[in-house]
């Protein structure tokens, strides 16, 4: 989904730091949604791939661990669930008024809040579509699924 200059990217399968780092290196001006059930390496390699990250929106049990790892590296905020994090990331990206990516690349397993990474990704896609539709009449570009 996209809304004007904002693209939503679902990489829910990025369940470890290395996979999330690859996603973070692929885009510019990223509003990154991360977290869930932390794996052994925690946020891992993703903490070294923050050059294009405008902010991190943390969810799940891993929030305190990830927040400590990101401290001093990029702005990070805690959110109670995926809906709250996606909404906040989109609001911040939209307020920026330039091309941006709201990226779900959790660097963690989904099992603290979802049945699978696919369920988490489907939830993100649904939220993204609703957010895109909510701004489709604002004159700043249409919404695209």
Mark where each language-model region is.
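ATP-dependent carboxylate-amine ligase
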Residues: 2-145
